[in-house]
Amino acid sequence: MTPKPNTSNPNVGLPLLSKDSPDIESLLILNPKVQSKANAVPSAVTKKNKHNWKRNEEKGCGASCGESKLKNDFRDIKHTTLSERGALKEAMRCLKCADAPCQKSCPTQLDIKSFITSISNKNYYGAARAILSDNPLGLTCGMICPTSDLCVGSCNLQASEEGAINIGGLQQYACDVFKQMNVRQIVSKEVRENRNASHKEQIALIGCGPASISCASFLARLGYTDITIYEKRAYIGGLSSAEIPQFRLPYDVVDFEIQLARDVGVKIETNRSLCKEDITLDKLKSQGAAAVFIGIGNPEPKIDPLFEGLTIENGFYTSKNYLPAVAAASKPGMCGCKRTPLPTMRGRVVVLGAGDTAMDCATSALRCGASRVTIAFRKGFTGIRAVPEEMEAAKEEKCEFLPFSAPRKINVKDGRIVSIEFNKTEQDDNGKWYEDEEQIVILKCDYVISAFGSTLKEDTVLSALQPCKLNKWGGIEVDSTTQQTSEAWVFAGGDVAGVAETTVESVNDGKTLMDLTFKIQIAAWNMHRYIQAKHGNVLGETPELPKFFTPIDEVDISVDMCGVKFENPFGLASAPPTTSGPMCRRAFEQGWGFILTKTYGLDKDLVTNVSPRIVRGSTSGPLYGPNQGSFMNIELISEKSCEYWLQCIRELKRDHPTKIVVASIMCVYNKEDWIELATKSEAAGADILELNLSCPHGMGEKGMGLACGQSPEIVKEICRWVRACVKIPFFPKMTPNITDVREIARAARDGGASGVTATNTVSSLMHMKADGNAWPAIGNTKRTTYGGMSGSAIRPIAMKAVSSIANELDGFPIMATGGIESAETGLGFLMAGASVLQVCSAVQNQDFTVVEDYCTGLKALLYLSGAESLKEWDGQSPPVEKHQKGKPILLQGQKNMPFFGKFRDEREKLEALKLSESNLLDTDNYHFASRPDTQVARVPTVEDVIEHEVAIIDHDMCINCGKCYMTCNDSGYQAITFDAVTHQPHVTEDDCTGCTLCYSVCPIPECIQMVPRKGPWKAPKRGVKPTVEPGTPKVVKVDQRGRVILESTGGMQ
């Protein structure tokens, strides 16, 4: 008989417990709800409302009317600038292609794939090292290089919907983080120890611009100790300092790169000119210079005869006197001035020219007070010379463009320019351009800036260049394949050599240029060859330039485990990356410290793998390409014979005696088999054995792998068999597919194992298709089995296994594996108790070369951990500064003023007011290189490391997405409100339990922080008052075995 429901309710008349209270309903007003009807809002209302939410500029006439908002605003304008969050997301998107076309399009041949790999692994030092090795001005070029015409233009992701990678922004970010580390450059130990008399030869470089700084840096890395750069100005940096505006290239960046050159012994003398009265080539040679590099650029403007007689007083500038004047007044630290006025630009400005310099002049004029700027040029938009980045910047800042216009006359009244007249230009059927005198345009203006290029024509400079031959244009005659002049001891690069058009190409003229068919050697290498030849040392034509080097690269990351010395703790796991002997050899050649062979057995247990067997994991959602969070495999052990692997071990140990070979072996549960295979492997020369007792699929049917590894008794007995027959260390491989991995590890130790490997893959069923079939599916019958999941998805499981074994068996060696994909994640395993690190899925995601990133990353982490001045850093990540879109916030702490709609307009007005009152030459907000550099008392070794709150939201960084609000509503405690007008979330402290869900889902790192509660802690909302209120734990402790120890206060506090 069915019992009758109890209808008596003691809470009759009270509010429903299963329904939100009115205050919570009010809080939930903006929380998403399932929509049951179609929306219908009049377009007129939407048109009006959208202005309340806009984050971009208004379009149409109203957007450009009124005074410029840019006066005195020299803040970073680059769209490519990234925060750490943006850099990581962009780097993770990169495909890291084979034979990367982006690198082929870079004049300095940066290893772009490698440095982006390092960024995605949070190894910013490794990325900066890769960049600065090929380009000593890597930060400068990251900021101003026209990447759309170079590396970005060749990015394979141009063929995808999401578009090319922001390579320049990533380069800028990595180098900027290294700049903040404040670590000096040094000459490598190898070079220092191999210096000879030739390295004491004098080398002179004229002009302290990009080409000279680059050339001098490479020569210093080659070991030369007497290198001097002569600069005619009182400040250094050449065009980078004088002619590229602060909002594109801050002076502290130039200062940083020059400091790196000085670190390796480059000397710089300012106020030294190339002229008969001071420096000439003949004088330098007579004073002992063995080689000279000329990098003076083109110092004089090309001026149309139309403008002869016009001066600044009339309102006429050239780019060569305008941009330096702007720089002197807006670049803190450049000339040591405390305050210098900007050139006054009240009214209308016309800029003549269509190159990058013209765009810089135009956008600078807006910051000097111009109300309107027009850029006039002879041809149409399709023939414009400026790179797209510069063109778009000028367009966004509301510069006007006047194409097909050639200046014919400037009208002056009362000593001031009042207008400029243009002839329209036309192109005939033969493609020839001409001016149409019948079509005239008159443009009223107050200032004219000529940006028609530059040249070298000053007689005193040309005479100082003798005996070098000049070309028909008056420049230096240079062999473009060697950068050598008519005088064998004189070299030239940059603008003065007539080839380079950009900073990155000037940098390259100081190093080497890759042609499609062969390498062209130029200045630094050829100067090195020339000097060495004088001393009887013949060098090949292929450049061999040393890489960028710092004290970080001297950190020792070797490890001693069980008496075996590992060069570094990174090795390849027994997995697809070690399928064959040649693959193991290539791994050693790339720098891996050790390898494990693919697991092999006796010939009687040979297997044949099925196909398909390794598939993309579903743990990362619809993510295709690299950076998969997991793989699922039903891979079996090696298909190759036992003798094949024994011979490979012999060859590998013979040719790579300092590398460690670990033989991964597997047998059925049979004493004779284990003894035979173990002794053969030891005799072949294996340094260590790994006993595969944990393969989760395919081998259990034969009584191998997991069939043995889940029983402590069987593991212990197998270990005893192996211990009795071999002297080398051996490590049973643990399975995570068990209740307590510590029991198996304890059994292995008791059986005489030297240590354990933790862990193998996690048994899983990854994909189930809509038709009910699993993937992978084998053959026509579509058979499958539970496979092994690997990759970062299993890292928490593997980390727990390593930590629990290390806590249970103090000092017991552990080879860790399972989701190790960077130096940072590897260091985490080492700190949890691992001795060395095995890698598999990360190589499947990329290639063998990731080991270089891991090694440099680990060295940097160890080095920086010893620096007291960087104690606020998290590994290689600097403290998160308040920012929007990667740029610092000028006005902080403005409550109820988000960055959209009318609030944005109000913020811009306040910012303009603050900028108008600010001193542009104040250095307080810039990070200049300082020496001595970051000091480290003691660098830890790898072996050294082997062993209540509420939320607060930072409205300066918040992007108003409401993710915190939604997750707190539907997965938490309804402790966050969300303003309907400002879209600003607010945490109600009394309701916040400190669960950190909001912190976990926030897309902006450190926008939400967990801080100590200000008010007294209140008891949880019990819903219905309990009959007994248990005591609140005062202290929560965990013992070494992971058991919780409670010390109760006996009552509420």
UniProtKB/Swiss-Prot annotation:
One of its GO terms (molecular function) is 4 iron, 4 sulfur cluster binding. Keywords: 4Fe-4S, FAD, Flavoprotein, FMN, Iron, Iron-sulfur, Metal-binding, NADP, Nucleotide-binding, Oxidoreductase, Repeat. Its EC number is 1.3.1.2. FAD binds at residues 207-211, 231-239, 248, 274, 494-503. Its cofactor is [4Fe-4S] cluster; FAD; FMN. [4Fe-4S] cluster 4 binds at C992, C995, C998, C1002. GO terms for cellular component: cytosol. GO terms for biological process: beta-alanine biosynthetic process; thymine catabolic process; uracil catabolic process. Binds 4 [4Fe-4S] clusters. Contains approximately 16 iron atoms per subunit. NADP(+) binds at residues 354-357, 378-379, 385, 451-453, 495-501. Pfam families: DHO_dh, Fer4_20, Fer4_21, Pyr_redox_2. It catalyses: 5,6-dihydrouracil + NADP(+) = uracil + NADPH + H(+). Involved in pyrimidine base degradation. Catalyzes the reduction of uracil and thymine. Also involved the degradation of the chemotherapeutic drug 5-fluorouracil. PANTHER family: DIHYDROPYRIMIDINE DEHYDROGENASE [NADP(+)] (PTHR43073:SF2). This is Probable dihydropyrimidine dehydrogenase [NADP(+)]. The gene is dpyd-1.
